[in-house]
Swiss-Prot record:
Gene3D superfamilies, sorted: Vaccinia Virus protein VP39 (3.40.50.150)
Keyword Protein biosynthesis tagged: no
Residues annotated as catalytic: 175
UniProt cross-references to InterPro entries, sorted A to Z: SAM-dependent_MTases_sf, tRNA_(Gua-N-7)_MeTrfase_Trmb, tRNA_methyltr_TrmB_bact
Catalytic reaction(s) noted: guanosine(46) in tRNA + S-adenosyl-L-methionine = N(7)-methylguanosine(46) in tRNA + S-adenosyl-L-homocysteine
Name of this protein: tRNA (guanine-N(7)-)-methyltransferase
Entry EC number(s): 2.1.1.33
Native source species: Rhodopirellula baltica (strain DSM 10527 / NCIMB 13988 / SH1)
CC terms in the record's Gene Ontology section: tRNA methyltransferase complex
GO BP terms in the entry: RNA (guanine-N7)-methylation; tRNA methylation
Similarity comment: Belongs to the class I-like SAM-binding methyltransferase superfamily. TrmB family.
Domain of life, per lineage: Bacteria
Binding site for S-adenosyl-L-methionine: 95, 120, 147, 175
Pfam family, one: Methyltransf_4
Length: 271
């Protein structure tokens, strides 16, 4: 079977091939989704088939001063906590892979008594998220343009994030790294899971959402094996959105609008 999508061709043996045709994002996506699911007996539509053209990311307003909201690894203090980042002792939560920053913008407004630190490896997205915070003058949220893994890691120099110092770790729709040889790059890797757990306080929560069932199942199994202190996985229910930005993240909005199941789980550290 051969499926023609916007600017791309996909077949089950070779995946995406040469670009063809003209860009048509509406009906062609729905046809692709239904035909592929029916032909291959799929229960969900794989996200790797959704590499549709995206609108260009708007550059932040040059009039906005992002210094208070956008940090680089060089800007960070030796120890990362609420006191060193925000100058107070409010509970600190970290989002790994903030993307365009919808979650950190919404959650920092909803819970002003908590601090939020978003980490995004792609600088243009980190800047976009920081601009959202700057525009709204969020005093309890900041963005880092950088890699989260070195910040959570335990090295010969010590720990950047102390044991039991975080109230929450959020990982939403991380890159699934489809090829088996690349899976070690996943955010929820063996070492990262151990470090996320180490950094959480007792009662702190690890949130993980994805639209990739294989990633979800493997991660739940891995956590049960190596981090039993996180307890049993607690499902997080889907709520109905009331407007176009009433979603956890932009990825959740896209997946739900295209009818793709989203798998959600939360862990509460027991000891």
């Amino acid at each position: 079977m051969l499926v023609v999508a916007a600017m791309r061709v996909w077949n089950p043996e070779e995946g995406w091939a040469n670009r063809v045709g003209r860009k048509r994002e509406g009906k062609i996506v729905e046809i692709l989704r239904r035909v592929t699911m029916t032909a291959h007996g799929l229960s969900h539509f794989p996200r790797q088939l959704l590499r549709m053209p995206r609108a260009a990311l708007r550059k932040p307003n040059p009039a906005l001063d992002l210094d208070s909201w956008l940090k680089t690894p060089e800007d960070l203090p030796a120890t990362i906590n609420s006191q060193t980042l925000f100058g107070n002792d409010q509970p600190l939560e970290i989002e790994v892979g903030s993307g365009k920053g919808l979650f950190i913008q919404t959650e920092s407004d909803r819970r002003p008594e908590h601090n939020y630190f978003g980490i995004e490896i792609a600088r243009k997205y980190a800047a976009h998220a920081a601009a959202r915070l700057a525009k709204r003058e969020r005093a309890n949220a900041k963005m880092l343009a950088g890699d989260a893994t070195p910040l959570f890691a335990v090295t010969d120099e010590g720990k950047r994030i102390e044991d039991g110092s975080l109230d929450g770790v959020h990982v939403y729709f991380p890159d699934p790294w489809w090829k088996k040889r690349h899976r070690k790059r996943r955010v929820l890797s063996h070492d990262n899971i151990l470090n996320f757990s180490r950094c959480l306080r007792v009662g702190g929560r690890l949130h993980f959402w994805t639209d990739v069932l294989d990633y979800f199942e493997l991660t739940v199994e891995l956590i049960a094996e190596i981090a039993p202190e996180l307890g049993v996985p607690l499902p997080e229910t889907q709520r109905e959105s009331t407007h176009d930005l009433d979603f956890h993240t932009h990825f959740e909005r896209r997946s739900r609008k295209m009818g793709i199941p989203v798998y959600r789980v939360c862990y509460r550290k027991r000891s």
